């Protein structure tokens, strides 16, 4: 079957033909290619068409598709283990590596996704502080947990859904919304609820309303406010962890969170997640503390092997980050030059190996309101043109593009060549 036939058949058995909404290309007039295989920075669909991949499975594939060392680790592990639901040495290896190589992580708990990591971190923060309210930021996406689906980014923003049916009012009544990069909105909430807020959760570099870095002074003030009021500061580094730097966004800003969540890259391409932080907080988790959180597949040996191999390879090769910074800078510069040549209203935000070209007439895109002003119709046409040109980018204006270790200058030139023909 060709791409269209497979997709139409899939629609009979899966809602929208997909298992995650953004994959359906519902905001575009083309159907998604059905991907068959990948190698390095390239993916190939069922019809044999090759694409330069700047989606990277929405971030995880930083080493490229089918990295030989990761594949070998997976193959060696499955010969002896697929799942036990019991302790293994592999989970110790990954946990120890993370604690020893990351800042601000004294202990870590493995889970199976970014959503699990963030919802578990919130539960832990509430249990530790004995408070119920949390603060999240408009446009930040922390997974599909009920309490987060308020003013969320990612697919919720792409689909223009104000929230989501099926989320009871009671699930979100303790979720307070502040404005990203606007500290006065945070201060006002703490003044109103000085002893009720358990935590602030934030993407230090937002990636789900497009790439929007937090201002350094903004994060510093969040740290000060949390310390003052006895609330916890949670950095959602599901996307930025091991990507914008090995030690994540917090290492670029020099701001210390109490808890950090991870996923995507840390699983080497397999379903993964983790949260960690201060020992006194993490020791509140069951079985040594009162906060209960569990998972049948948590610490799965195959995932642990892939994750351990990936993180060790990234940690032992700092030149990878130098390379991705170089490629990212060249791509950003090139997009800006071509946009100017063609009279396209484009603002490029980039932090290391993630970037977003916003089709916006504003001078800068620094917050949620700026992001929402983007010309999504124009971006949609650009997306369709690039896909047809063999450049695989996100169908949504509000998702990031990802640079990987295997991307090179030639692929930057291919991207820019395609853009010039738009």
From Swiss-Prot:
SUPFAM superfamilies: PLP-dependent transferases (SSF53383). GO terms for cellular component: cytoplasm. Keywords: Cytoplasm, Isomerase, Porphyrin biosynthesis, Pyridoxal phosphate. Its EC number is 5.4.3.8. The modification N6-(pyridoxal phosphate)lysine is found at residue 264. InterPro entries: 4pyrrol_synth_GluAld_NH2Trfase, Aminotrans_3, Aminotrans_3_PPA_site, PyrdxlP-dep_Trfase, PyrdxlP-dep_Trfase_major, PyrdxlP-dep_Trfase_small. NCBIfam families: hemL (TIGR00713), PRK00062.1 (NF000818). Belongs to the class-III pyridoxal-phosphate-dependent aminotransferase family. HemL subfamily. This is Glutamate-1-semialdehyde 2,1-aminomutase. It comes from Clostridium tetani (strain Massachusetts / E88).
